[in-house]
């Protein structure tokens, strides 16, 4: 999508209709070093989700620098989860890469409180940066989902 509007509140934001209609729950410090292509296993990189937005931290966070690696990172168990007390991998999360924002959705239909990641959507929002939330209510700097 090349002209996504996320800068204003109320009805001005564009809405992305996704399968689950839900954002992923907050999570913190999930080890995602397995997403590094050619990594040796001793790297230090974790993912956290706040308001549906994934950020990486750790001394090797910069090694996750391709779309494929980012998708692998958000596919690690616990990054996308339904709720704080439900590990099912249901919902959408966003991340920024190379001047674009990506919305990635998992639809875990197992309903067994275990992460069974099933990526069903990867949506590129070309040129969109500064997103600080994924939500079902419009707000500034928010990807609006339904």
Task: State where each predicted segment sits.
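Acidic glycine/aspartate-rich repeat arrays in secreted/surface proteins
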Residues: 2-146
